[in-house]
């Protein structure tokens, strides 16, 4: 599936500043994991996570709905400002990221390491 459809639906959720989507190999399949950066003072609770999923389901398709939604404080970006999906996918799968020098904020990758929700 394309991530653009998910990102366009996130724009409809005012609490979400931006998001990052990856496919995680999980249980002999691939599941969608959505990381969101939220507005200041907003916490990701079950109600907000469910609303995010419902917004994506209605605006895209059921296949686009993330299995896991997690809040993070920062998203890694390339020096040109693009969100680094591939780098996050590698970290989540326990692999190293070789081109960290291409990232403007490589320290943000640590936010995605060894997350118990993704084990």
Language-model segment annotations:
Residues 10-19:
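Short acidic amphipathic segments
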